[in-house]
């Protein structure tokens, strides 16, 4: 997992809608305009979706909404992008269903995860289901939790003066990572309450405000190429 996970915060920072369902790579010489144009979000078939690309990213990351909760993204780039589809608000008791038809990642780093934020206190969370060559396992190891037929290691880290959904803030990251990648082409569940309860038992309960969006995220960084096709429900 990328050391500065909170760069994914930009995905959930804005909620501007976009009529296009396929979002091509964005190029602009003006840094401010590039920052704005490289973020798109909206709703599709009742699901919230978003894609964000870092300033200076070269190459491409092409996101497309499919039917229902489906989306796909293909990329060949050097930089960082995040995208996904899910809900306009989080929930500590949501059970996420998904089927990842394909996930390939060559070079760089990245993961596919259930992702979101809470407030009061401000916290960033991930449940990592799949990844590239490097398993997300940075930060302090806290405990192990069993859920949905798998075993997850729980990690936490403190971020000081880092990007967040509320601007530059200090906040805690908390995340669960499966001990092995989940399989593709099959239906899976993420019983989020199991993770939220395990984090709370370790002393790092999520905030009381779960209103920020929560998505099934695809993220990649560095020099990488790949493809993900996933349906969430």
List each model region and its residues.
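Short N-terminal edge-element motif at the start of the domain
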Residues: 31-39, 58-106
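An exposed acidic His-Trp-rich patch
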Residues: 121-184
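Bacterial Sec-dependent N-terminal signal peptides
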Residues: 5, 16-38
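Long, compositionally biased interface segments
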Residues: 186-233
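Extracellular-facing/secreted segment signature in eukaryotic proteins
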Residues: 46-47, 56-66, 145-160, 186-191
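Boundary/junction segments of secreted and surface-exposed precursor proteins
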Residues: 38-46, 50
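Extracellular-facing segments of soluble proteins and assemblies that are Gly/Ser/Thr-biased and enriched
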Residues: 84-147
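Sec-dependent signal peptide recognition
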Residues: 2-8
């Amino acid at each position: 997992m990328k050391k500065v996970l909170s760069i994914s915060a930009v995905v959930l920072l804005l909620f501007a809608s976009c009529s296009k369902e396929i979002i091509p790579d964005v190029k602009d010489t003006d840094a401010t305009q590039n920052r704005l144009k490289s973020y798109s979000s909206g709703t599709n078939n009742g699901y919230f979706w978003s894609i964000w690309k870092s300033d200076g990213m070269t190459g491409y990351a092409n996101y497309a909404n499919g039917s229902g909760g489906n989306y796909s993204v293909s990329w060949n780039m050097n930089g960082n992008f995040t995208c996904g589809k899910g809900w306009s608000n989080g929930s500590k008791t949501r059970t996420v269903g998904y089927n990842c038809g394909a996930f390939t990642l060559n070079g760089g780093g990245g993961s596919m995860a259930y992702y979101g934020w809470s407030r009061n206190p401000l916290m960033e969370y991930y449940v990592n289901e799949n990844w590239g060559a490097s398993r997300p396992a940075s930060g302090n190891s806290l405990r192990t939790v069993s859920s949905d037929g798998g075993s997850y290691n729980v990690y936490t880290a403190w971020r000081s003066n880092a990007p967040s959904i509320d601007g530059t803030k200090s906040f805690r990251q908390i995340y669960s990572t499966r001990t092995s990648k989940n399989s593709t082409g099959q239906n899976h569940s993420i019983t989020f309450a199991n993770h939220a309860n395990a984090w709370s038992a370790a002393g790092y309960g999520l905030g009381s405000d779960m209103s920020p969006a929560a998505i099934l995220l695809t993220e990649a960084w560095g020099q990488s190429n790949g493809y993900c096709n996933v349906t969430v429900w």
